[in-house]
Amino acid sequence: MKKKSFCLNFRANKKKKNFVLSKKNIFGKTQKFKICVPFFTYTENKINTHISPFDSFSCLFASQSIESLQNQKFSKYSLQKYQRSNQDTLIVQRPMVREGDWVQSGDLLADCASSLGGELCLGKNIFIAYMPWEGYNYEDAILISQRLVTEDVYTSVHIESYEVETKNTKLGKEQITNKIPDIPEKEKNHLDERGIVKLGTFVHEGQILVGKVTPIQKKYRSGYEKLLYTILEKELIPMRDSSLRTPKGLKAKVVEIKILNFSWNFAPTEKTLPSPIQQKKKNSKILLKKQRKPERVQVYLAEKRKIQVGDKMAGRHGNKGIVSKILPIQDMPFLPDGTPLDMVLNPLGVPSRMNVGQIYECLLGLASKYLNHYYRIQAFDEIYGPHASRSFTFAKLYEARLKTNQKWLFNPCYPGKMQIFDGQTGEPYDSPVTVGIAYMLKLVHLVDDKIHARSTGPYSLVTQQPLRGRSKYGGQRLGEMEVWAIEAYGAAFILLEMLTIKSDDISGRMTLWSNILLNMPIYIGTPESFKVLICELQALCLDMGLFQLNKKGFLTQIEHLMQLP
């Protein structure tokens, strides 16, 4: 072998025949050696070779260098896809590099759902105007265009988890199965053999997600019923349907299913213990994986939510508000070039809060739209002068006017404002309006998660008042200041209902329904909170006496709280 050669021209003697090593010979199954130009090091073959001591010494160091390259660690990053965040939003990561790209420390490898090019990107740049519009943006309300809904500008994906768990009852254990009584087969087509919804299924309101049955007490069945079940070839299963179903008003897709098993079935076998102690095989047990049954199932549903009336939006300057109305595109105010606006904000939300930066943002955004430029303004730029922001913004608007020949972009008489037109009548508005492009965000406070109604629900054990909170199916709290407001209006009977039969008057709310049906006067009892207060004062060793008027008009003392009406 030539020491400085870069070609594979080495000849070896194998079975008394000479052959030339090619690429196939090197990487084949017969010959295994490590290559380092210009050295060859043999590791697992038995070829008779004659290598000089100098070449052997050089090959040793070359082999060590190759092994050091082979032992290098490779960093592996697993990207998340369609995962759920703590706010029930979507977590998805998309790679920004391809195989073979050279990267170094600090380079961007992947983007998430809320970033673009490694920068935070949570909202959209849209056309806005600061003007009142028929009272629909009163008190920080927001008027938006139908374009934001149809083009999915603010459509978000939310993932919610629903869980079902089997419990042990007095009559037996609950089971997760697809054999649900009194459910037709067409309503179970989307379930697998275990009774769990298939991955990727689109589900709607009331559809079964996880089939579960609960044992019930066996009822006496007459001979006619038994004959009927025999004719229909149905079994008398003492089970009731307790399946997990899709919540009301939800249309979503199943994106993930987690099955948790806590109980295992055991069975003895001869292979469990070694031969010297086979006599104890009756006490040995082995896990049978095929007989595992799910005890807890978590189903993750992904839902698309378009922006709607009641959703909360905000800008980058704390200018938040609630969507009050969605107007058709043709009814929105439009610019002199015919561009319809996307959003109308209330101008009264600017001076009182002193966040004038939103005005500079929307005007500079308008200039950047027509100049096709991108501006990055650092905070506290007034260090360059008292009017640095205003001067820079007006200069860019004037530059956009000169380059595009759109004179309405900058008017020296009222800089930063322009004449726009009513979309419903086509007539221009009386006064010029501030119009621009601002960065607006959709917040996680959605109306679907806020809206709630209650008729009759759970009550607290101590105070006997309705529970609070939407998750507990609670009621609306009537606090101290709300009571003052009702008192100020003089609504005495509404206040009486709120504090008694709608709250913690046990006897009153039990007789309310029957009294209404029988056209009888509504009975008002004593609130339970008053009784709790008396008991707490008596626990402090205070003698609290309760008196009531008898039929003769005299006061008589009530000996016990249970005697209160």
UniProtKB/Swiss-Prot annotation:
Its main location: plastid. GO terms for molecular function: DNA binding; DNA-directed RNA polymerase activity; ribonucleoside binding. Its EC number is 2.7.7.6. Keywords: Chloroplast, DNA-directed RNA polymerase, Nucleotidyltransferase, Plastid, Transcription, Transferase. InterPro entries: DNA-dir_RNA_pol_su2, DNA-dir_RNAP_su2_dom, DNA-dir_RNAP_su2_hyb_sf, RNA_pol_bsu_CS, RNA_pol_Rpb2_7, RNA_pol_RPB2_OB-fold. GO terms for cellular component: chloroplast; DNA-directed RNA polymerase complex; mitochondrion. In plastids the minimal PEP RNA polymerase catalytic core is composed of four subunits: alpha, beta, beta', and beta''. When a (nuclear-encoded) sigma factor is associated with the core the holoenzyme is formed, which can initiate transcription. This is DNA-directed RNA polymerase subunit beta C-terminal section.
